[in-house]
Regions:
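Gram-positive cell-envelope targeting signals
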Residues: 1-30, 102-103, 111-113, 154-155, ...
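A conserved glycine-rich beta-strand in the N-terminal activation segment of trypsin-fold
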Residues: 96-100, 122-156, 211-213, 246, ...
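C-terminal cap/linker of serine protease catalytic domains
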Residues: 98, 178-181, 318-386
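Gly/Ser-enriched beta-turn/beta-hairpin loop segments
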Residues: 129-131, 217-223, 236, 278-296, ...
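PDZ/PDZ-like groove recognition
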Residues: 226, 301, 350-442, 449-451, ...
Length: 472
């Protein structure tokens, strides 16, 4: 693949000069001793063992000469009849990229989380012995550092990290949300220690000098995403070098997946694997109700306490939030995809700052259609070195008195795009509709472009009002 070749050459170019490999058909021939870029227009100079040189040009070579370019030059210079595969095996030493610098960068954006709940306590014989506070662990990433200029830094974690179905709401602040949430930045480690009984009779905890008190902003049980916040001056008092995560534009099967979490509450640690599947439905019960969640499947090892931590690609960009694992197979684990993460987080932050106390947490809309898919296929893009699955999204039925009914969607329509405020957003998978719905707000105008009876049709538009939305 083009991308892979560029990575390979980027790794071995430095070694080309350092170890002086012999690009020779046989030992008696003149061989290449080095290759350097000698200009800004893609010109490379080849140095030979007899002291001579030659040049060749690689168009658009800002990313470096590729292994295939070297192979072609080798054939031209030596006349050797060797296959590309043999050339790679003989002369090209390709090492896996070192992700240590990537991890180091991501650690600036990562916290371990402790969430405190009052819940029933049981002895070893499963007999109820009363109520007390307990602490659960997870992780979080820094999402936004005062971007909306409100003096706060916003964090993202899993909803199930800060929500406990077993919490006693009457004793836990009239809520299943943690009554206290603290975070620790990497390098400023700490953990809570029991410090006697509080005025409420429950165990109190000392979070130490490095513990950062966090405030719950809102969450979505249907996305398994929650947002926390802290005054920016408070978190920067611990470390002024914190960074918000970089967000990936996309992700692909086979791509590196680096998880940073708080396994077993033993401190932030790093594991690495790849994305196995871009779209898998899993079932979780967070609040006692089983729900289906669209997830990335990864073979990256994750453990109890990894929940809420970031999943990063090899460039250090966030591609998801780890949230679930398979207890029977450590190589099957899951993460919330980045479009759901950011869609939900932005949604929560919007409603937390809209000045309306009646709107909290996250909201989405229901278009009022049932859809099916057909014609699914994998499409490879040689320009990126990746591929993706596409499918036709077909309207199976339209519910009466809904947005879809009002704008004129019809059974049998094939949805091509959703138009939001005049901007077309392509619909190539059924889940695109729910992902985009997370980004919609009251006042947005929506319409659809569909294929109907062999023609392209644009429906009428509908301007969303808050009553079109429901809490998720």
């Amino acid at each position: 693949m083009k991308t892979a070749k560029k990575v390979a050459i980027a790794l071995l170019c430095a070694a080309t000069i350092a170890v002086v490999p012999a690009f020779a058909a046989c030992s008696s021939q003149t061989y290449v001793t080095g290759i350097t870029k000698s200009g800004t227009d893609g010109v490379y100079t080849v140095y030979y063992s007899d002291g001579s040189t030659s040049t060749f040009t690689v168009p658009n070579s800002s990313d470096g000469v590729t292994a295939e370019d070297l192979y072609n030059e080798y054939l031209e210079q030596t006349g050797d009849n060797i296959s590309y595969t043999e050339f790679l095996e003989k002369y090209m030493t390709v090492s896996a990229p070192d992700t240590s610098s990537t991890v180091a960068y991501c650690l600036q954006s990562t916290l371990k989380i402790y969430a405190e709940f009052v819940k029933p306590q049981y002895n070893d014989f499963n007999m109820f012995v009363g109520y007390d506070s307990s602490v659960y662990t997870g992780a979080a990433v820094i999402y936004d550092i005062d971007k909306i200029e409100d003096g706060y830094t916003y964090l993202i974690t899993n909803y199930h990290v800060v929500y406990l179905a077993e919490a006693n709401t009457e004793r836990n602040g009239d809520s299943n949300i943690a009554r206290a949430i603290y975070g620790y930045l990497y390098g400023s480690d700490g953990s809570p220690t029991a410090s006697g009984r509080g005025s409420d009779g429950y165990t109190s905890y000392d979070y130490g000098d490095y513990g950062i008190k966090l405030e719950y902003v809102g969450g979505s049980v249907e996305s398994d995403i929650a947002v926390l916040k802290v005054p920016t001056e408070d978190i920067k008092a611990i470390n002024e070098n914190i960074q918000a995560v970089d967000i990936a534009d996309d992700y692909h099967v086979g791509e590196t997946a680096i998880a940073i979490g708080n396994p077993e509450g033993n401190g932030l640690s790093v594991t690495q694997g790849v994305i196995s599947t871009e779209n898998e439905q899993i079932t979780l019960s967070i609040d006692g109700i089983e729900r289906a969640y669209r997830s990335l499947r990864i073979d990256t090892p994750i453990y109890s306490g990894n929940s809420g931590g970031g999943l990063f690609n090899s460039e250090g960009k966030l591609i998801g939030i780890t949230n679930a694992g398979n207890t029977d197979d450590q190589n099957i684990n899951y993460a919330v995809p980045i479009e759901i993460v950011t869609g939900t987080a932005d949604n929560i932050i919007h409603y937390a700052n809209d000045g309306d106390d009646s709107t909290t947490d996250a909201y989405s809309i229901t278009f009022g259609i049932n859809v099916t898919s057909s014609g699914a296929k994998y499409v490879y893009d040689s320009s990126t070195g990746y591929g993706e699955i596409t499918e036709n999204v077909n309207v199976y039925s339209v519910n009466a008195d809904t947005i879809a009914d009002a704008i004129g969607l019809k059974q049998g329509d094939v949805i091509k795009s959703l138009v939001v405020n005049g901007t077309e957003k392509a619909i190539t998978r059924t889940f695109n509709l729910s992902d985009i719905a997370l980004t919609l707000r009251a006042g947005d105008s929506v319409s659809f472009v569909v294929e109907r009876d062999g023609e392209t049709v644009t429906t009428s538009s509908h301007t969303l009002v808050q009553s079109d939305f429901h809490q998720i």
